From Swiss-Prot:
It is found in: Membrane. The keyword Cell membrane does not apply. The gene is UBP18. GO terms for biological process: protein deubiquitination; proteolysis. This is Ubiquitin carboxyl-terminal hydrolase 18.
Length: 631
């Protein structure tokens, strides 16, 4: 007798159940990790703490003091070794103080697309998902700020002083001397160190991934507290994150690493306000990093045919100076940098006014000097053994006023505080060793060779064959808005030119209308409709913004209409006056060169103020100023 039904193999069924169980567990953990990555869980309600806000780090636990690998992902300041310690600290008061430590749960993440919103009923387990895109909400709702960092606060950091700080050596992690010297120079850049030690960046950081400024703050804090050399592996191991072409274990250029580091810090500052694509170019110049290293170069080109002058501005973070000919000092190199250059031959300049390639004179100057001036001497030329090893003397006090666009006001004076030297063999440019000389906040100079520190005199520093020089202004810039005033002046000049063009068009139409109205009218050249002042005294009006070209056109057109609508009596009086004027000229009673102003006999039927048409030339603009914003 056959059994009815599907035959069941117990071993196959067991394996199937086990497989389904492991698949379910895998899918569960996958969804859990995905949710933890893309959602912020808010449990700040009064119900208590039942979520683990953890992030990887390496500090001591704030509860038991053991080695910790996690931290609170809200404030990013308190660290724990386990979830039990975090729950204990949460219930003992961290729940109330977490907001004061740093970022709260309501702060939008810079990366997460969605977030969890805490339940209004006080039960943290009943948290609900707020299906609102944080990224899209930030871009559409955040209003662009004109000033990202207060300049007055920067001036306080610039004048900050801490004489107790002493230099600390850094261990060489394998061809990392190029990074060690830059980290030493940045660690003794006064406004940057003052900001990291006094205010700090970690609590305000909006990044969920690796942040160079956060790591550099940890580096500065450790260097200020340590008496022994330590390894900067937290930064060296992330060279590819700092610069795409940098690599761990390879010999790299110190100047290139510094450029990457400054650009990375600038990018971090912009991320706090939405990123480089959202922040306007003008506001990008108001970050802390721009206040420290940012300046402005002016490139001026003058046409030799029409004398047309064109100015272009470019943002600068450092100054790369070449060593041409017999230049033996930094001042001579700067003279060559700002010297006039003739554009001719195959390098002719295309003039916008001439619309042709012409011979021109070009000069590059400094429009706005930075607070921290970084000068890189271009010692490397073509070839593997093409390094220029000649000594270039440099002063302790550098006066930058002779190299400014407008001669300077005497305040662009700098003091030397760091020197980077590249040691090589046989003028090789592909290998060598970097050392640096640093001046502390008390004025003492030190020679730092990785982990070795030696006190030196100023004469030893000035005798070196420097590769990079770092100068600090004696006094911070008085204002950071000089570029904006220039742009405002440019816009005002452009507006005047536009108004003049509109006036010319209106004037030509007025002349045509008057001539067509009456052929016996007196001669009128290029009239510009104005109103003569009223004889009765009146209080001076308050200044008002200049009218737009459309308003000017409408006003002048209204004057034309009023002229065209003159009655026959006014026309006859004008004809009679013109006839009398011709008779006087014929009899010799009047000078024929004097133009009779027929408008004197015109009157507005609606007002007692007479209308006067006078000769007025539009302003001619010889300067075409352009602005190049650094991206």
């Amino acid at each position: 007798m056959h059994e009815v039904g599907f035959p069941l193999d117990l071993s196959v069924f067991t394996r199937l159940i086990a497989t389904l169980f492991f698949l379910a567990v895998g899918v569960f953990y996958f969804l859990k990790n995905t949710a933890a990555k893309y959602f912020d869980i808010g449990a700040a309600a009064a119900g208590g703490f039942d979520r683990d806000f953890m992030a990887v780090d390496a500090e001591d636990c704030s509860v038991c003091g053991n080695f910790s690998t996690k931290k609170c992902s809200r404030c990013k300041s308190v660290r724990y070794c386990s979830a039990e310690c975090q729950r204990s600290d949460w219930s003992s008061g961290h729940q109330r103080n977490c907001r004061d430590y740093g970022i709260t749960t309501l702060t939008p993440s810079a990366k997460n697309g969605l977030r969890f919103r805490a339940s209004p009923f006080g039960d943290s387990s009943a948290s609900s998902i707020a299906l609102i895109s944080e990224r899209g909400q930030n871009k559409s709702s955040l209003k662009p700020r004109e000033v990202l960092f207060p300049y007055e606060e920067f001036v306080e950091y610039f004048n900050w002083d801490n004489p107790e700080l002493a230099p600390c050596g850094l261990m060489n992690c394998g061809n990392s001397c190029f990074a060690n010297v830059i980290l030493q120079c940045l660690s003794w850049t006064r406004p940057l160190v003052a900001y990291l030690l006094e205010k700090g960046h970690k609590r305000e950081c909006m990044r969920n991934d690796w942040c160079f400024l956060c790591e550099f703050q940890t580096h500065v804090e450790r260097a200020s507290q340590s008496r022994f050399p330590f390894s900067p592996m937290n930064i060296i191991s992330r060279l590819t994150n700092i610069g795409g072409t940098l690599g761990y274990g390879r010999q790299e250029d110190a100047h290139e690493f510094m450029r990457y580091a400054i650009d990375m810090m600038q990018s971090v500052c912009l991320d706090e306000f939405g990123g480089e694509k959202i922040v306007p170019p003008r506001s990008q110049e108001t970050t802390l990093i721009q206040y420290i290293f940012g300046g402005l170069l002016q490139s001026q080109v003058q046409c030799t045919v029409c004398n047309h002058v064109s100015d272009q501005y470019e943002n600068m973070m450092d100054l790369i100076v070449e060593m041409h000919g017999d230049a033996g000092s930094l001042e001579e190199c700067l003279d060559q940098f700002t010297a006039e250059e003739w554009l001719h031959g195959d390098n002719m300049y295309k003039c916008d006014r001439c619309s042709d390639y012409v011979k021109a004179c070009k000069r590059l100057t400094i429009r706005r000097a930075p607070n921290i001036l970084t000068i890189a001497l271009k010692r490397y030329q073509g070839g593997r053994y093409g390094k220029l090893n000649k000594r270039i003397s440099f002063p302790e006090t550098l006066d930058l006023n002779p190299y400014m666009s407008e001669g300077g006001d005497g305040s662009d004076v700098y003091k030397l505080y760091a020197v980077i030297v590249h040691l090589d063999m046989l003028n090789a440019s592909f290998f060598g060793h970097y050392i640096c000389y640093i001046k502390d906040f008390c004025g003492n100079w030190y020679r730092i060779d990785d982990s070795e520190i030696e006190s030196v005199e100023l004469e030893d520093v000035l005798s070196q064959r420097a590769y990079m020089l770092l100068y600090s202004r004696i006094q911070a810039r008085s204002s950071s808005s000089c570029l904006r005033s220039e742009v405002k002046d440019e816009k005002k000049t452009d507006t005047l030119d536009t108004e003049s063009c509109v006036k010319e068009l209106v004037e030509s139409s007025m002349v045509g209308a008057i001539e067509s109205r009456s052929s016996t009218h007196a001669t009128i050249e290029d009239p510009v409709c104005e109103q003569s002042p009223s004889p009765s005294p009146s209080p001076s009006p308050s200044p008002s913004p200049s009218p737009s070209p459309s308003v000017l056109a409408s006003e002048c057109c209204s004057e034309v209409e009023r002229i065209d609508t003159l009655d026959s009596e006014s026309n006859s009086s004008i004809d009679d006056s013109a006839t009398d004027h011709q008779e006087d000229v014929a009899n010799g009673n009047k000078d024929p060169e004097v133009k009779y102003q027929a408008a004197d006999s015109w009157s507005d039927p609606t007002t007692s103020t007479p209308l006067v048409c006078t000769k007025s030339k539009p302003p001619v603009r010889d300067m075409d100023t352009k602005m190049i914003d650094a991206q």
